[in-house]
Amino acid sequence: MADTIHWADVIAEDVLKKNGKHLVATGITPSGNIHIGNMREVVTADAVYRALVDKGANADFIYIADNYDPLRKVYPFLPESYVEHVGKPISEIPCPCGNCANYAEHFLKPFLEALRRLGINPKVYRADEMYKTGKYTEAIKTALVKRDAIAKILEEVSGKTVASDWSPFNPRCDQCGRITTTKVTGFDLEAETVDYVCACEHSGTVPMAGGGKLTWRVDWPARWSVLGVTVEPFGKDHASRGGSYDTGKRIVKEIFGHEPPYPIVYEWIMLGKQGAMSSSTGVVVSISDMLKIVPPEVLRYLIIRTKPEKHIQFDPGQPLLSLVDEYERLRTQFRENDPSLGTFQGRVYELSRATGVCQSEIPFKQMVTIYQVARGDFDQVLKIVKRSGFSTEDKKCIKELADNVSKWLKLYAPPFAKFKVKEKVPVQAATLSELQRAFLSAFAALIESRDEISGEEYHMLVYSAKDEGSELNRRIAEKLNAHAPQVDPRELFKAIYISLLGQSSGPKAGWFLSSFEKEFLVERFEEASNYSPEINV
């Protein structure tokens, strides 16, 4: 049986079985380009937050940038010079481009801007600031004192032996700056300091506030306790048996005295045939790059339409057109109060909407046609948009969509989606049959006799040629000196594309033809109907 209640509402109803204020949290380490695989976590959290608010809940939504995590290795996109920074917190090492405050901000800034464009507005926390301002200090004290109890939980749940010199806190070496090569040798609860020795042979004392960080399996449950997190989505890797959620839910209860958050486990987004996206392997399409190609609400729709536990296949090539078409049909149904639109699909649309951002009425596919007919000239784009029956009042939104299409054509569009209008009748017109030539001449005369013609009307006019007694059929018959010719519309569409593009196929004919000035079509079709290689040399 088809779903009638959206998954975000189902989760919200479950969450609200517990009274009180709710905090939806999401967190990502900005160690590389934050990609649309990561976006699933944030959009999922936003959908549940919206659902909670819609149900009248007292709820907040936060995003934690785990920028105090160490650089794990020299990733493929980094120069070898970064080897000296491996093991240091990414908030404390240089920006790759030199224009940001640090490495983490280089990747975080475009991601936060992408969230804004997606209509997602969580309160943003940076982990380095939380540690340095002392938000974690009490949790660090508790973890250090209860080190043995935490180690026991880790061993019982994960099945792995914890080393005798393991500590829940990783001090940051004053000498080399790393947090992955230090060992705790002692701590002072009153002074709130930790003693350590580092593999670089330096030893020292650091403050608990900012002098290091909790290990991941302790940091996560400590965060739930410190911030009061009640709901959090996370990838299936954290949800594996004996994984960080399994250990975290015991640590947060038994060590920090707080209930674990409601878990929302999500599957990966697979990039075409390349597999699951990963910043560290370079199999990515960053959110900011994808927003240069796809309208924000379509990216939201990609996530919202699918339950979190199901994987998503994403291909920015030809399949992207189908995705956009699907969303645009849903939008039309919703706006026209289509009775065939079910409750579930209606809710999908509501949660896909990116509030406060451009939402052009022009279909993406139609802009693909318009942009290429206009040869990328935005003034011409505006003229065609107006001629196609759309408002040109919001030029900013039209420009944004045109830019999306421009990037898509350049980077991902399959060959069949691209075309170039020939400046003169192409030589391929020599291959036109007698029937095709008669059609083009008759079609030109019929167009000339009409006022403005819409894309749908162009489409229907061409198809009318097959109907005996139609005006176009009669005109073709006159050109051929024949009675009611047998016409295959496919041959007529082929004639249109040959005369304009020099190829036998092209974009949807109605949209395509309505993009041109009527006078241009009349002249071109008449010329093509009389084309001869000898005459047109």
Curated annotation (Swiss-Prot):
Top EC category: ligase
Catalyzed reactions per annotation: tRNA(Lys) + L-lysine + ATP = L-lysyl-tRNA(Lys) + AMP + diphosphate
Cell compartment(s), UniProt: Cytoplasm
Entry GO terms, CC: cytoplasm
Keyword list, A-Z: Aminoacyl-tRNA synthetase, ATP-binding, Cytoplasm, Ligase, Nucleotide-binding, Protein biosynthesis
Motif residue range(s): 'HIGH' region: 30-38
GO MF term set: ATP binding; lysine-tRNA ligase activity; tRNA binding
Highest taxon, organism lineage: Archaea
SUPFAM superfamilies per UniProt: An anticodon-binding domain of class I aminoacyl-tRNA synthetases, Nucleotidylyl transferase
Annotated EC: 6.1.1.6
Ranges spanned by the short sequence motif 'KMSKS' region, renumbered to the chain: 276-280
Chain ranges passing through the membrane: none
InterPro entries assigned: aa-tRNA-synth_I_codon-bd_sub2, aa-tRNA-synth_I_CS, aa_tRNA-synth_I_cd-bd_sf, Lys-tRNA-ligase, Lys-tRNA-ligase_SC_fold, Rossmann-like_a/b/a_fold
Family: Belongs to the class-I aminoacyl-tRNA synthetase family.
UniProt-recorded name of the protein: Lysine--tRNA ligase
Primary gene name: lysS
